[in-house]
């Protein structure tokens, strides 16, 4: 949303260099943030799963980790195209993402169970569909932006990268925090429920995970 708003303002004023600077600064910022978060999530999956009192989820967390990187870049590219009033790339990328999530995740989850693997590996297989969907969606937008590169000449002097990053944070952080509220509540809820099922009722981790899954349904 922050990228879309900033790009829209520059687009309305005809500031082509400003638009390019916003995108180039944002893409590198989100590239770094996404890469760090994905690496931490992948290699610290066990710690995150233990925090949720569900060590069985570690494999699924690792399967989801690359998607974090892809989503960061997707947000930047979608914001850039939307800010120019072009919703088609976003719409196509979202359709691709949804189709692959279902088309890869569901068959893979079924296949893993069919060959006799554990439920947690089947869950990880389903999550692979999410990662594949976001990755293909990201590649589609990359190809679109390369083939539709902004080559318009302009004499405007763009803002510095530092100013753009500051503006992204000022706009984006409050929005991100408000949108993350429900996700944070769900994480805390999962931790509490799994902990009470195991420590309060004395259930095994597997039994607690099954009951927690039924509770979520």
Features from the language model and the residues they span:
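Helix-terminus/linker motif at the lipid-water interface of multi-pass membrane proteins
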Residues: 49-50, 117, 176, 180-217
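Hydrophobic alpha-helical transmembrane segments
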Residues: 93-107, 116-147
């Amino acid at each position: 949303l922050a990228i879309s708003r900033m790009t829209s303002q520059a687009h309305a004023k005809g500031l082509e260099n400003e638009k390019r600077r916003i995108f180039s600064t944002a893409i590198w910022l989100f590239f770094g943030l996404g890469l760090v978060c994905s690496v931490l999530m992948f290699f610290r999956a066990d710690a995150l799963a233990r925090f949720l009192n569900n060590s069985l989820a570690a494999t699924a967390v690792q399967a989801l980790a690359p998607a974090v990187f892809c989503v960061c870049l997707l947000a930047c590219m979608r914001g850039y195209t939307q800010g120019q009033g072009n919703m088609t790339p976003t719409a196509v990328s979202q359709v691709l993402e949804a189709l692959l999530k279902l088309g890869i995740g569901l068959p893979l989850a079924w296949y893993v169970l069919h060959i006799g693997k554990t439920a947690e590996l089947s869950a990880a297989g389903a999550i692979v569909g999410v990662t594949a969907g976001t990755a293909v969606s990201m590649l589609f937008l990359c190809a679109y932006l390369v083939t539709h590169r902004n080559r318009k000449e302009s004499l405007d002097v763009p803002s510095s990268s530092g100013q753009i990053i500051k503006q992204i944070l000022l706009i984006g952080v409050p929005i991100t925090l408000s949108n993350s509220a429900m996700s944070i509540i769900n994480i805390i809820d999962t931790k509490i429920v799994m902990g009470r099922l195991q420590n309060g009722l004395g259930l095994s981790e597997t039994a607690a995970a099954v009951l927690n899954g039924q509770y979520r349904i």
